[in-house]
């Protein structure tokens, strides 16, 4: 039995009380060679944005090495850490694959507390650019944050995901081929994330690249 219950697109959109940019992919379909940026995917109107790394692997001399943070890999390979370190720079400096999608416990705690008045978390999974290939679910907020890897428990595990609690206190986006969670929220929330995960969170602006 699935831990996620199906809902309609109308029910999902009714709860998604957010503002989308004019060039958000739902309002303006990007061309094939479009370089995606944060506002193409995440809602605008939140105070701050960031990317949080999930476990990822980089190869060197035929061996694969597991990392959790961004700077950690520079130190391991004895490379200077860029200043400033940006998501685009990290993405260009390493060839990597996603190791797993276990959400850091500290992040789960912060997100759960910031939405403690919400009873549900809502999820959209789009497996392709076809709107008919999008699926919508809800699950209990407390249950969602008990799961080590909530994506593994979803009816469809792969695709592009939009996730938010009822009331949209924060907003999360994730692609299954990138070891990243993109987050939008209040300044206080993002400050808490950067404090708890100093090497796993990088600040973003709306016009930064979305990978």
Task: Give the location of each predicted region.
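Acidic, proline/glycine-rich low-complexity IDRs
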Residues: 1-211
């Amino acid at each position: 039995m699935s831990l996620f219950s199906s809902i309609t697109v109308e029910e999902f959109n009714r709860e998604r009380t957010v503002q989308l940019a004019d060039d958000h992919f739902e309002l303006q379909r990007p061309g094939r060679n479009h370089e995606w940026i944060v506002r193409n995917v995440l809602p605008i109107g939140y105070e701050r944005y960031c990317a949080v790394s999930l476990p990822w692997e980089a190869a060197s001399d035929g061996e694969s090495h597991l990392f959790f943070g961004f700077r950690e890999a520079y130190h391991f390979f004895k490379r200077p850490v860029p200043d400033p370190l940006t998501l685009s720079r990290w993405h260009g400096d390493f060839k990597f694959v996603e190791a797993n999608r276990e959400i850091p416990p500290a992040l789960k705690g912060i997100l759960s507390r910031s939405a403690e008045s919400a009873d549900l978390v809502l999820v959209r999974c789009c497996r392709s650019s076809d709107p008919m290939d999008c699926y919508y679910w809800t699950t209990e907020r407390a249950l969602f944050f008990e799961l080590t890897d909530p994506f593994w428990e979803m009816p469809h595990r792969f695709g592009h995901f939009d996730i938010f609690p009822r009331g949209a206190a924060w907003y999360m986006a994730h692609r299954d081929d990138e070891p990243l969670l993109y987050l939008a929220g209040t300044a206080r929330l993002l400050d808490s994330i950067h404090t708890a995960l100093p090497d796993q969170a990088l600040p973003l602006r709306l016009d930064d690249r979305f990978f």
